[in-house]
Amino acid sequence: MRLLAAVVIAVLLWGVGLFAFADRVRAITPAPEPAAADGIVALTGPSAERINAAVRLLEQGKGQRLLVSGVNREVRREELRALTPGSSRLFDCCVDLGFDAEDTMGNAQEIAAWARAKDFDSLIVVTSDYHMPRSLLEIRGMAPEVALTAHAVRTPSLDTANWWRSPADARRMALEYNKYLVVLARETVLGLTGRGEAEPQPEAA
């Protein structure tokens, strides 16, 4: 009986946390105009909108350089440049590509290494709305000395206001929440026991 009660309480707490997480995701878009930072980082995803949003911020002078983290190794620089708005000159001079990251933890390692190599103390982080909480948690774990500003991009295929009404949206939100909890637990343990860091280096422009 006690075990059943514990399970019920755990499920209820998880559900409350899920709704709080989803409300946080809903609230971060539309993204407000960010203050300028030393650099801008974009985490790649299923569409080019994250990169496009980051390039627009670079054009507005919101950062000195832009890192696109997690670029597919088969994608050439010229191909990526052709898919993004703005001038080729700006892309050539001020955009760095990171090819080592294969997941969000890899993005965080890549971003931390880039920020240290450039001696940047502040970054604007560009990624999808539902991906932002976990991304910030990962990056803060790898680069706690760097100030982060979130600039979330809305996911057109995800109704963040009514996600529970769609089985697909509910699955996506629950999966991302579970991933967030795993990272939160890991970062809590690492914060108590120490951390070893791997620092993959992004390609210089």
Question: What is each of the regions a protein language model found here?
Answer:
Residues 1-31:
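N-terminal type II signal-anchor transmembrane helix
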Residues 9, 158-159, 172-175:
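Alpha-helical structural elements
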Residues 11, 16-18, 127, 174-177:
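Generic intrinsically disordered, low-complexity segments enriched for polar/acidic and small residues
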Residues 22-167:
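A structural signal for short, hydrophobic/glycine-enriched beta-strand patches
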Residues 166, 170-196:
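A transmembrane-helix-recognition feature enriched in membrane-embedded lipid enzymes
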Residues 117, 202-205:
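C-terminal luminal/periplasmic domains and tails of membrane-associated envelope-modifying transferases
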Residues 196-197, 204:
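A nucleotide-sugar donor-handling region in carbohydrate enzymes
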Residues 17, 123, 133, 180-183:
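Generic signature of intrinsically disordered, low-complexity segments enriched in small/polar residues
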